[in-house]
């Protein structure tokens, strides 16, 4: 490779690293959603004295252990919650930055330097929900990637401490996302497949997981008692239908995926025709062209959703999800080009991602195509076979593998740079930023003008209508859970998830915890017009028991008298 070519490659890599850093800085200020608010509110409840798995019925509450510590530190330093969102966002970026450094040191031992850089850039840029805060989805990604790295390291170097660390990482995955028990099973399968002493290593792995689970369960029983703990678990399973799949909604979940499958099928047919007609002369050039067709079709579909349709819900995740599919397909077709060590790393990442996919699918209300966005470990290791698809540069100027990987990584960096996950839980382009939140926990977060204005109005009216420390219930279809923090309110709902359920289960909750019955109820409205079904059980109960109503701009406040 010539000196000028080497300098050119270094410049391209520097561009990607700078872009990845800028994306994370952008993400600190711009990518804050209702899921971010939910993570903050869960930690806030812990700090306010609500007992986990007793008074709290959030499905992901066990993931709050990192956020609770960080928010405790923040409160001790500042004495309030203003700017707390920014603090947690910065902490999340720093944690992933440190993890990226660790991953780089691991992959560098077995892979070429430029390939290692590309893999780590993907890890630094991609998130399941494209938000930087240390919340359950990011924790699941972080611990699963570390777990797969520890497993691969054990399979290669045979150091037993790595097997123990891998088991502990899987336990942390379960704390982050309870259904990640499925991931533990997949990891155990990897141990059986790769280990030379299969029985011994399986029992070591399973023993560490079982012992860790027993210790944590003992802690919960000690805090809550066996009867109360079992009752709470039963309540959690039956109280929140926002994360439960219903038969009638199966079509909604899979119809989104079907459109993507049609595009992929068209790509496969086109690729097969071109190869069959011998449009391309060599096998390697065919692989390269097949890859190009897949990626172009994927890119076109993503841009169609982002820019023609004006966003697709969690569009940034969707775009990443769709692009990951051809990466996995093409890499699997070219696995034979890899060394045995590379195959071990690849299969560990792919198998971990399969476990992640099923773990999330069990406990999510996302469309299936978005769940693929959790398969970031697969995207990372897919670069290994892709690196070998195109031969190195020769005298005729054949495209080098770095060019292919550069385009892939550049797409992800560019997409994460120009798209933001907005405060209102929508996806928009960075040009949609018009203002900044100036009060409350989200102070300092960039947003649209309406998001800024509505937050300002809500905080002002909260100060007028709600006394500090009162029991508060916020009712709406998409609740910003940080609203409970405006006046240090005690949460009167069993869950602060943004898609909380409002039904008769609340009466059971208040019956068990009378001190949680609301003093004031805030119902989403639009200048006096309620934005919640007035014929619902919740509104009928409010009107019967909380007849005194005061209308605000975006919330109506109800009191008993």
Task: For the regions a language model picked out, list residue spans one by one.
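Extracytoplasmic catalytic/substrate-binding loops of multi-pass membrane glycan-assembly enzymes
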Residues: 28-44, 51-70, 78, 82
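Short acidic/glycine- and proline-prone juxtamembrane loop motifs at membrane-interface regions
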Residues: 132-141
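Membrane-interface alpha helices of multi-pass inner-membrane proteins
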Residues: 128, 150, 162-178, 184-189, ...
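Transmembrane-helix signature of polytopic, membrane-embedded enzymes
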Residues: 11, 98-126, 161
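Perimembrane helix-loop-helix junctions
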Residues: 156, 182-213, 217, 243-246, ...
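Short hydrophobic alpha-helices at membrane interfaces in multi-pass membrane enzymes
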Residues: 146-172, 199-207, 290-292, 343-353
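Extracytoplasmic
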Residues: 409-560
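Membrane-interface transmembrane helices that cradle and orient dolichyl/undecaprenyl
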Residues: 108-114, 145-163, 195, 329-342
